[in-house]
Amino acid sequence: MPSTTSKTHTQPSGRQIQRHGLPRRRWQDLYHVYMTVSWPRLFVSFGGFFFAFNLLFAALYSLQANGIAQLNPPGFWGRFFFSVETLATVGYGDMHPQTLFAHIVASFEIFTGMMSLALIAGMMFARFSRPTARILFARHAVIRPLDGRPTLMLRAANERHNVIMEAQAHLRLVRDERTIEGYRIRRIHDLPLRRSEQPAFLYGWTLMHTMTPDSPLAGATSETLRTDNAFLILTLSGVDETTGQTLMARQEYLPEDLRWQHTFADILSRGEDGIERIDYRRFHDIEPLN
């Protein structure tokens, strides 16, 4: 019976989900593992592979005592450093294989070493070239009257100094509901936004959903949302103007992240010189309505 995993995932909102019973296939999905592991663990992993690889071939060279000429330092560590030089194709000219067995081992090491280094280089390039979105989301969402109707408002900002072209936003409500048969299921509702597209997303973006009688949030309160295990998922996507790559970001909001009868602090001001200024130090600030 294959071994299974038990792993806890922490969502952007802080919500934790623990998964059990999935087959353990970490070694069959190394590409995804190395794309998602932290940089320190990645370098430690590559360093450990490099050390173990050369230890293995040093042990193979040790099977024949006179396989390497001018071995220095003598013994196992001399063979280890010869393996390092062979893997890197340095060719200092002092130590070299002098028997058929040593030549065969060195040839096999060069072949496997080139393949391994090519894979490592490709993985590093994939990590560096992977598009990342530097999108700042407000810590809280607010609900306030706007144009006579309660409106859910969220705020996002582009942390980079370049433009995200054709930015699109989608807001969804996830909550537990009961069917007419009494079966409890989790449903996802789309929450229409007043403006879900931005042709050029450079500074900030306030996203608004009007809680009309037809809205899935109509009549909702903090208590009902908690009872239904509800949360909001906001996703943003667009094209980086500099690289032409598609960017994606998401944020989740739990019921305790919603602030009723509050509004976002104004971060835009105009100085006496006529220049408009955006103060991102107040980006997360909210204010109660009078």
Question: Which sequence ranges carry the predicted segments?
Answer:
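Extended, solvent-exposed segments with strong compositional bias
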Residues: 185-226, 239-245
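Acidic, serine/threonine- and proline-rich intrinsically disordered appendage/tail regions
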Residues: 242-290
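Cytosolic juxtamembrane amphipathic/interface segments immediately preceding
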Residues: 20-43
